[in-house]
Amino acid sequence: MKIEFFGDLASIATVILAFLAWRQIVLLRKQSTTAFEDSLTEHYRRIMESIPTDIWLRSELNTLDKERHDRCRDAIYRYFDLCNEQALLYNMKRVREDSWIEWCKGIRGNMDLPAFKGVWTEVREKCPDNFTELSALVGH
């Protein structure tokens, strides 16, 4: 009788420990995903630092002087690359749904800015096979 009790107790303890281990794995995976998404957001912020305020206020790219124009154009291209990577990662289930929804809102808003539209048109004409995931998202 006593041996059965300890056997039952050991079984219950094993189940509890298995549950706690599973819960820890779930939490670590969530933490890892959050850190990964945060790194993509930080990458976005670094790119955006090269885009002048005038562009965010709907100015055309050609209103900038040559140096700022070139730096901004390069930053917008890097932004397209980041967005394409984000879309690919979402399709691979490496990004959470709620994060992706927020990113999509931002992507669509940025793609509506004249400077972004201009660079996007140039990219699509010169490299139509690039940025396929981003193309699917923005519809052109």
Where are these regions (language model features)?
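Membrane-proximal alpha-helical anchors
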Residues: 3-70
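An amphipathic alpha-helical interaction surface
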Residues: 68-140
